[in-house]
């Protein structure tokens, strides 16, 4: 097959920008620590973010089920299971492919963060094949209040779907998360790994048997939308779940599934997207690993589409490609910009890592003389620029990781960080009272160390402030892939 050629502006790739030196080890440790600030439920004695305390201890009570635990997705107090599952998948992928670059302490903490998510996801599928749990908390009342998690008195309604109502996207992502986590824990805790895999298998069976989107069900749509509607459909999560189960089990039946459903499920559509809603980019990169390692010809089209994604990082390529801000930030429209930057950069580095370890010909990315190819170093340079932009090498000279460096936003859109801790202010802060903290001109009393926030706009401008949620709200699904990127650059600085 003739190699796919992607032309681009060479100077962007072969000349490194003048940057300050960053402490990737410190950033990595902090990016994992962030997850302790998002914990829900009973907090352990070894909790390092001591301004956080137990919260939401009756979750699931309205359905007579234990749904205590898990993560709050962002700056509010809702547990949305769809993005939580994606977060868990990416924490697992970071551990699987980049755990060898982490220190023993960082790898341990990453696995602790992963287990916190996977333990909770096991609860969400504990009643399959009859019922799957979708979410805990009512967004409208929650968003009408500004309450720290420890005090919240808004309804903690748990939502569930009964079979045969469809939930392919939610169940497919949970299956992917549990399968990926089973791989991450296989060496450290084989019994737990098997438990995760067994549940991944039956969750995927539910996803495939009851096809359709979980947000198409009236009883959950009003609770989930517009926050985490499955806009991209459910088919990508079925491919995503199958790809992770193939990697976890090695079974050829998942190869067959991927081959039979590739076109009808849209693996070559919107291939330059990756995040909590759209898994197409991730599917193609993950399946490409099979082609590199085992030369499975039947799934080679996934690798071909992954190549198109890689080419889209370079501006003068034919067809769709990424957009960049004047300061070099990979930019896609959305409510939280850096989630796109981090997730897509993760795929670039991961694909190049797979390619560099294979015997296959590198991807040709320039057709002039001399020829240039997508090598590990080229990917490193591109990924390095995006990581360093987040850490402070940007026109604002601002670190978008809270607690990293000397200049980072002191006010973020986060209830727990902006409210006084119950350690210093044990009196409950009620719904309307909390808005005093929201509108305070003072810095947040609690530093949510390691949180990567939404970030700047397409012109590299950053206004900040608690009212500007798109710029200052952190999310778990930004940090999860960032863990892998930081681990790699800690061991392989450009």
From Swiss-Prot:
Q: What's its catalytic activity?
A: Endohydrolysis of (1->4)-beta-D-glucosidic linkages in cellulose, lichenin and cereal beta-D-glucans
Q: Where is the signal peptide?
A: 1-21
Highest taxon of the lineage: Eukaryota
What sort of enzyme, by top EC class, is this? Answer: hydrolase
Q: Which GO terms describe its molecular function?
A: cellulase activity
* Gene Ontology biological process terms, A to Z: cell wall organization; cellulose catabolic process
Q: What is its EC number?
A: 3.2.1.4
Q: What is its main location?
A: secreted
Entry keywords, A to Z: Carbohydrate metabolism, Cell wall biogenesis/degradation, Cellulose degradation, Glycoprotein, Glycosidase, Hydrolase, Polysaccharide degradation, Secreted, Signal
Per UniProt, subcellular location reads as: Secreted
Q: Which InterPro entries match?
A: 6-hairpin_glycosidase_sf, 6hp_glycosidase-like_sf, Glyco_hydro_9, Glyco_hydro_9_His_AS
Give a single Pfam family match: Glyco_hydro_9
List the catalytic residues. 76, 413, 473
- The residues that the database entry marks as glycosylated are 468
Cellular component GO terms held in the UniProt record: extracellular region
Q: Which family does it belong to?
A: Belongs to the glycosyl hydrolase 9 (cellulase E) family.
Question: Do you know which PANTHER family this protein is assigned to?
Answer: ENDO-1,4-BETA-GLUCANASE
Put simply, this protein is called Endoglucanase 22
Q: Tell me the organism.
A: Arabidopsis thaliana
């Amino acid at each position: 097959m003739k190699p796919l050629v992607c032309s681009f502006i060479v100077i962007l790739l072969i000349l490194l920008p003048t940057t300050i030196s960053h402490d990737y080890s410190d950033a990595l440790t902090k990016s994992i620590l962030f997850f302790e600030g998002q914990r829900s439920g009973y907090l352990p004695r070894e909790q390092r973010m001591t301004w956080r305390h137990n919260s939401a201890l009756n979750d699931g009570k309205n359905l007579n089920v234990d749904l205590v635990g898990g993560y709050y997705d962002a700056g509010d107090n809702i547990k949305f299971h769809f993005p939580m599952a994606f977060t868990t998948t990416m924490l697992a992928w970071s551990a699987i492919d980049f755990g060898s670059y982490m220190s023993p302490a960082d790898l341990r903490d990453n696995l602790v963060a992963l287990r916190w998510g996977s333990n909770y996801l096991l609860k969400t599928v504990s009643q399959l094949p009859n019922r799957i749990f979708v979410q805990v908390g009512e967004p409208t009342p929650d968003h009408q209040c500004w309450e720290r998690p420890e005090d919240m008195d808004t309804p903690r309604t748990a939502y569930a779907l009964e079979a045969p109502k469809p939930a392919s996207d939610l169940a497919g992502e949970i299956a992917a998360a549990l399968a990926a986590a089973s791989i991450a824990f296989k060496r450290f805790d084989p019994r737990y790994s098997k438990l995760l895999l067994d549940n991944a298998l039956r969750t995927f069976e539910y996803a495939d048997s009851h096809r359709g989107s979980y947000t198409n069900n009236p009883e959950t749509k009003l609770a989930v939308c517009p926050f985490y509607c499955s806009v991209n459909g459910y088919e990508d999560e079925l491919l995503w779940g199958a790809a992770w189960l193939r990697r976890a089990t090695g079974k050829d039946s998942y190869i067959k599934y991927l081959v039979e459903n590739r076109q009808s499920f849209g693996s070559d559509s919107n291939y330059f997207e990756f995040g909590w809603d759209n898994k197409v980019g991730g599917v193609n990169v993950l399946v490409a690993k099979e082609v590199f390692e085992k030369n499975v010809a039947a799934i080679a089209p996934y690798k071909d589409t992954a190549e198109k994604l890689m080419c889209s990082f370079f501006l003068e390529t034919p067809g769709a490609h990424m957009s960049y801000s004047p300061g070099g930030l990979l930019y896609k429209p959305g409510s939280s910009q850096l989630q796109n930057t981090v997730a897509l950069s993760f795929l670039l580095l991961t694909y190049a890592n797979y390619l560099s370890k294979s015997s296959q010909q590198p991807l040709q990315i320039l057709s002039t003389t001399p020829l240039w190819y997508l090598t590990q170093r080229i990917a490193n340079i591109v990924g390095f620029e995006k990581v360093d932009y987040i850490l402070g090498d940007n026109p604002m000279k601002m670190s978008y990781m809270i607690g990293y460096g000397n200049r980072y936003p002191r006010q973020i859109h986060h209830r727990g960080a902006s409210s006084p801790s119950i350690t210093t202010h044990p009196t409950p802060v009620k719904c309307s009272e909390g808005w005093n903290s929201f509108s305070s001109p003072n810095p947040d009393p609690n530093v949510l160390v390691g949180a990567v926030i939404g970030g700047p706009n397409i012109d590299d401008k950053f206004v900040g402030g608690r009212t500007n949620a798109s710029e200052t709200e952190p999310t778990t699904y930004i940090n999860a892939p960032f863990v892998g990127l930081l681990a790699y650059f800690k061991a392989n600085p450009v």
